[in-house]
Structures are given as C-alpha cells and as structure tokens.
Amino acid sequence: MEGIIFIVLSLTNIRQAVFDVIPLSLKRAVSVGIGLFIALIGLFNAQIIVGNPATKIALFNFKQSVLGGTFHTVGITVVLALIGIVITGIMLARDVKGGILWGILATWILGILCEVTGLYVPDPKVGAFSVLPDFSAGLASFLPADPSPIFLKLDFSKVASVDFLVIVMSFLFVDFFDTLGTLMGVASKANMLRKDGTLPNIKGALMADSLGTVAGALMGTSTVTTFVESASGVSEGGRTGLTAVTTAVLFFLSLFLAPFFMAIPAFATAPALVMVGFLMVSSIAQIDFGNLPEAIPAYMCIIAMPFAYSISEGISFGIVSYVIVNTLTGHTSRVSPLLYILAVIFIAKYVLI
C-alpha cells in the first residue's frame, strides 16, 4: 500500500516538489547528518561504542572484557574493527581503487586467522558468530532460498482498520523522508546538485524507488529502498545508472555465493560504514556558518540524525527550525508556502503519532 502511494506521489511530482523546496543549506546538512548517523551505526555494530546505563553510551571496556572472560569472543572483534578502520582509512588516503572493499576483505581475513588460531572463539549467544564460510549443506549451500512461502502472501484482512491506516502513514512518512534524505546526501557528495539545490532527472530515481518498494512487498522482503551506502559507490566514481545496474547484477550473483557473504562479520563491515560516514561529513565545508538563519537549521538537522537515530527526524528538525528561525528573523522571502506546510505536517506528526 505504501509503495502504491509512493508511485502516485512520484507520478504527480509531489515528491520532487518536496525535494526541490528544501533549501540547499539543509541538503548539505542532510549529507553531513547521514555521515554521522551511519558512522554511529558502524561503531555500534562493531561494539566500539556500547550502551551504558549511566552515560547512555560509552566506549567498549577492554579491561572489563578481559576480567569477564569475553575478550576472545567480543573484545577481539572490537580490536579487529579498529584495525579495519585504520586499514580502510589508509586505503582511502592513498587513493587505492576499491579501498573500502579491500578494507572489508582485509579485516575479514584477519578475523579468519584469529578464529583458526583460537584467538577468536565464536559464541552465538553473545552475537559472536563464526567467520568461516559454512558449506555443511553441500551444493545446497549455494542455492538461493525458496521464496514461495512469502511470495505474494499478502494479507488484506486489516485494510479497513484504523490501525492499518496509522501503520501505513507512519511507514510512508519515515520512508518518504528517509529516501529524500538519502538522495540529498548522496547527490550532494557526488556534486550532482544544481546551484539552486535541485537534482536533474530526480523523477526517474523516485519512480525506481517507488517500484522497488512495491516489488519488495510482493516478494515478501523488507522494504526495498534507497540506501545511504550508495555513497561508497559514489566515492569510487559511480555517477550513472550503469553503476546501479552493475550492483544489481552482482547482488544477483551473490545469491549463489551466500556461504561467503553470510560469513562476513559485522566487525569487518563496520569500518566501511565509519569511512563512508567520513566521506559524507566532508560536505560540511559547503555550509555557510556565517549566515546564521541558514546555519542554525543546518546544525539542528545535523545533530538530530545521529542523536534521534533517524534520517527523517533530522530532516524534520531542519525544516521546522528553518521555518521558525527565518520567519522570526524577518527572512520570510526564503520560506516558500510548501515549507510552511511541511513544518505544520512535521509538528502535527509529533503531536498525533
């Protein structure tokens, strides 16, 4: 249902209008906020940063890990992730082609060596899984899973209920602005935005995203949407649809190499997220912090994404603060009617949902 609404919004150019009306300073801020957000995700995935009841979050405690007997299951993976960040950073600094991919492979290989030598001891109970490919099912290990149990298994029994409407609208809101935020961030990093902040040929990208959402639902998968990891492809020079098509072909081939890809651990992919975050944050240099009515909303957008753990919340904070700050400082000419409407919608969401 959400995907169908997306298609309608894309065909009627509503999504494009929302994208175009967001000020360029906020588009730059979205790129920075996404960078901090995915870097935080990477640090959490690697357990370099962990939850803490006293301070909310904290760095991993190696001493506690050693004394608690978890160093060889969790502590060593944190060490490997830190090494992976260094390796990936060096690769990028030396302008090595495919540096992020080589960083993942190098960290994975180090993990395999640690498991083989006994330095890393897998324990699924604490989320420490084996990093060795599992071929126990023989040739069946290389065959894609049977989609028939979930393919076209749609349930329309609750369509007329209020709860269903609330869920659809909630998903629509989050996915709508997450996708726009990702497009803003990646396009900004790729220097594809025009001087007025608009993006050429955005309608095709939005339609592809909408159709992907519908196709994913029919296949029974989680939402197929635009991912911020696309920035890693942009950093390697990807700019056209050929990049996306090539990626799709490789994804298809990966279905038949599942044992290898499923063995790649979180501590090997986390450094990639951290470094992609760095690439995204570089857009902060393009924000004019001397222009406070533009800079303050950009700042609110940036800090909201990692702290609220949501791209859409960052956009919400940015737009609402932009409307308020510019209206109350006499810069109403910068605020279009659509921005006022969006600000009201965001505020209503916080009150009603």
Regions flagged by a language model, labelled:
Residues 1-34, 185-284:
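Helix-loop-helix junctions within the multi-pass membrane cores of secondary transporters/permeases
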Residues 2-10, 32-47, 78-93, 103-116, ...:
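Hydrophobic core segments of alpha-helical transmembrane domains in multi-pass membrane transport
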Residues 5, 22, 26, 71-75, ...:
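Hydrophobic alpha-helical transmembrane segments of multi-pass membrane proteins
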Residues 17-27, 36-90, 117-156:
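Inter-helical loop and helix-membrane interface segments of multi-pass membrane transporters/permeases
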Residues 25, 29, 74-80, 99-101, ...:
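Loop-to-transmembrane alpha-helix initiation sites
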Residues 60-66, 104, 108-203, 344-348:
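Helix-loop-helix hairpins and the membrane-proximal interhelical loops
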Residues 71-75, 153-163, 198-199, 288-292, ...:
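Helix-boundary and loop/linker segments of multi-pass membrane transporters
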Residues 90-101, 235-241, 282-293, 308-312, ...:
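Membrane-helix interface "capping/anchor" motifs
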